[in-house]
């Protein structure tokens, strides 16, 4: 295994040479309810974390597929969560716009935001392509590599499903 000398892999912090932690956060969902990464991740065998923004056509185009995945995931002890980059810091206009897009797309899964200066906020700002989707296990570890690009693309959903299957196989909760 090639782990960089600083022990940092893909923007998170490492628990050991094989795992990368998703940055911990406390924030709110788009309805103003408190959300913490600890409770979110520990409550699910896997969490699909999708980074998107409101004016990104491929991002908006996959919201329906992500909602269908969320409904399917619930039966397997998992969830889908969205992080809209425009809502970092709790900008009221951006939150209203995101809620409008989600409603029009029929997406009912939770979307969260947090302080832009937090570790998770910095992680979000370092996402270089949208949409980008991560799978996080019950312990807050990122599973495999992120899916870059819409999950509606060729092979993307299969790759995402493989990460979910890995998280489920490794779940010790």
Where do the model's predicted regions map?
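N-proximal helix/coil linker or "cap" segments that precede and/or mark the start of modular domains
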Residues: 1-26, 41-44, 96-100
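A short beta-strand-turn-helix
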Residues: 24-47, 71-72
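Short active-site neighborhood of thiol/selenol oxidoreductases, capturing the structured segment around
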Residues: 36-60, 66, 79-84
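Loop/turn elements at helix/coil->beta-strand transitions in domains of secreted/extracellular proteins
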Residues: 42-47, 74-81, 105-110, 138-141
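Solvent-exposed loop/turn segments at secondary-structure junctions
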Residues: 53-58, 85-90, 115-120, 129, ...
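Structural microenvironment flanking redox-active thiols in thiol-disulfide oxidoreductases
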Residues: 60-104, 116-121
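Short, internal strand/loop/helix patches
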Residues: 97-139, 147
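Thiol-/selenol-based redox modules, centered on thioredoxin-like
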Residues: 135-173
């Amino acid at each position: 295994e090639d782990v960089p000398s600083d022990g940092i892999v893909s923007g998170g912090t490492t628990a050991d040479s094989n795992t990368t932690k998703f940055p911990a956060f406390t924030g709110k969902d788009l309805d103003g309810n408190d959300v913490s990464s600890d409770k979110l991740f520990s409550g699910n065998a896997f969490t699909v974390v999708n980074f998107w923004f409101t004016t990104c056509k491929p991002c908006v185009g996959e919201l329906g597929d992500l909602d269908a995945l969320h409904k399917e995931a619930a039966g397997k002890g998992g969830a889908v969560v969205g992080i809209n980059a425009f809502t970092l810091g709790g900008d009221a206009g951006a939150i209203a716009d995101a809620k409008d897009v989600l409603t029009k797309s029929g997406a009912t899964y939770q979307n969260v935001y947090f302080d832009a200066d937090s570790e998770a906020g910095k992680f979000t700002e370092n996402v270089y392509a949208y949409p980008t989707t991560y799978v996080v296990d019950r312990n807050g570890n990122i599973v495999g590599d992120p899916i870059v690009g819409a999950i509606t693309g060729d092979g993307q959903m299969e790759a995402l499903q493989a990460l979910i299957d890995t998280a489920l196989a490794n779940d010790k909760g």
